Regions:
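A short helix->loop->beta-strand "cap" motif at the edges of active sites that frequently abuts
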Residues: 116, 173, 319-323
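Phosphate-binding active sites in nucleotide-utilizing proteins
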Residues: 244-308, 312-319
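Internal gly/pro-rich beta-alpha loop/helix module
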Residues: 129-240
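Cysteine-nucleophile active-site neighborhood
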Residues: 297-371
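C-terminal and late-domain segments of enzyme folds
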Residues: 111, 242-244, 256-266, 358-437
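ATP-dependent carboxylate-amine ligase catalytic core
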Residues: 2-114, 122-148, 158-162
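Residues that mark the start of a beta-strand
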Residues: 8, 36-39, 245-247, 272, ...
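Structural motif
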Residues: 10, 89-91, 119, 151, ...
């Protein structure tokens, strides 16, 4: 497509568990099979769904989050990544209007910010004509939300779909088709360390869903209903840089891969970015800043413990006063050891006088505001591990708040020029070196 207008849509639902991710993966693959270059986005801070998106579309997927990002930045990122696309699919998070406070930061607000319509995915199990009231409510709850169509999921039969189609028509929402009820179309658990091999094995899922979409969904009508002008790329403010020309090393492999592409873009503005793999026992490259992102170190404890060259080079760099920003799994890697679910300890870098453990796993999650050195940074927390309290350990710095400005129990540890904590930061609009000033 070379037109100034391209199909652009938000895939949203009434709640989590409705099948948004599964449908999105199938739609991305169906459009790719038509020869379209389709750009995907994900509402919210999630790292995992974008990996599924890339598997389905063949293109990197980008997060859009109105808690961590300014509206101007959201629009700029969206526009920049859609310039070479023939179609755009944005997957929502939770329910359409669910935000961190009321609907602030919701999928609906993101769609409004970038100016695209919404296609609802409705779980139709045990539903019939009464679904029309639900659709009418979603369409009219907010006048600035454009709900143009609906796809029904988990539909029992053509006769079942007839009731649903009539309900949608009477609610003023275009019925675009349905996905039949089947147990085969399930995305794996949210807490999985997906290797490249496992991702490739998952490739059958988008293929299967794409086949169902082509058979039961009017894709042409969907694309036509969502045709909108391609956004012009605004003039973006330059990423703040305190001293350009620096060297930044980023750990990136199967153990450490929770990375926002826009953060890498911000780091590139600071200087030269190089990547290395602790899992492959690669030594830390020469750098002025080491970025250890989150990921799944708990799935590779034996390999990381055996990677002595990588561990010792990081420990030596930190001991010499090198700057380190470590998030979640990256922080765990800096600890003396990580204990698995059975309590077995595996030696790690020993930069922090702490132990991380997977024992008694309990999910901790939420948005975070980090206030440090007179500045505010934003991010989110999502982890099952915990830090074993130590009598003597690192100092804790800064203050962390929830999205509702309540004090969060999340800690940021500091030792020399090492900053480590559970919060995954989004710093694409800020100078990451300012964290150390």
């Amino acid at each position: 497509m070379t037109s100034t207008s391209i199909p652009q849509l938000l895939v949203a639902a009434g709640s989590s568990g409705s099948g948004k991710t599964t449908f999105t993966l199938g739609l991305l693959r169906a459009l790719k099979r038509r020869g379209l270059a389709v750009q995907s986005f994900k509402c919210g801070p999630d790292y995992i769904d974008p990996k599924f998106h890339q598997l389905s579309s063949g293109r990197p997927s980008i997060n859009l989050d109105l808690f961590m990002m300014s509206p101007e930045h959201v629009r700029a990122v969206y526009a920049r990544h859609t310039q070479e696309a023939d179609a755009v699919v944005l997957e929502g998070v939770m329910g359409l209007y669910d935000g961190y406070v009321r609907m602030h930061g919701s999928s609906a607000e993101v769609a409004k910010t970038v100016g695209i319509p919404t296609v609802l995915l409705v779980d139709a199990r045990s539903s019939a004509y009464s679904v029309g009231a639900l659709l009418y409510g979603f369409k009219h709850f907010r006048q600035d939300t454009e709900v143009v169509g609906v796809v029904f999921n988990r539909v029992a039969s053509e006769n079942h779909y007839r009731f649903l189609r009539e309900a949608a028509e009477d609610a003023g929402v275009i019925p675009l088709g349905y996905i039949p009820k089947t147990k085969l179309l399930e995305v794996p658990s949210r807490h999985l360390g997906l290797s490249l091999r496992e991702l490739q094995e998952l490739d059958a899922l988008p293929e299967d869903v794409a086949a169902l979409i082509e058979k039961h969904v009017d894709v042409d009508r969907l694309l036509e209903a969502c045709m909108r002008p391609r956004p012009a790329v605004p003039i973006e403010e330059a990423v703040p840089t305190s001293a350009p020309g620096r060297k930044i090393a980023v750990a990136r492999d199967e153990a450490f891969n929770f990375i926002y592409e826009e953060n890498i873009r911000a780091l590139t503005a600071q200087g030269e970015v190089s990547f290395f793999s602790p899992l492959k026992d690669e030594a830390l490259p020469e750098c002025d800043l080491l970025y250890l992102p989150g990921g799944y170190p708990e799935f590779y404890l034996s390999e990381l413990a055996a990677a002595e060259r990588s561990r010792s080079s990081i420990a030596a760099y930190a001991a010499a006063g090198g700057r380190v920003l470590a998030e979640c799994g990256g922080m765990m890697y800096l600890c003396r050891a990580i204990r698995d679910e059975e309590g077995k300890a595996y030696p790690m870098c020993g930069v922090l006088d702490q132990e991380a453990t997977m024992e008694g796993m309990r999910l901790r999650l939420g948005y975070r505001k980090l206030r440090l050195g007179g500045r505010e940074y934003r991010g989110h927390e999502f982890h099952y591990s915990s830090i074993v309290p130590q009598e003597v350990g690192e100092e804790t710095v800064g203050e962390q708040l929830t999205a509702r400005d309540e004090v969060a129990p999340t800690l940021l540890y500091r030792r020399g020029n090492v900053l480590a904590g559970y919060t995954h930061l989004y710093f694409a609009e800020q100078d990451p070196f300012a964290l150390f000033s």
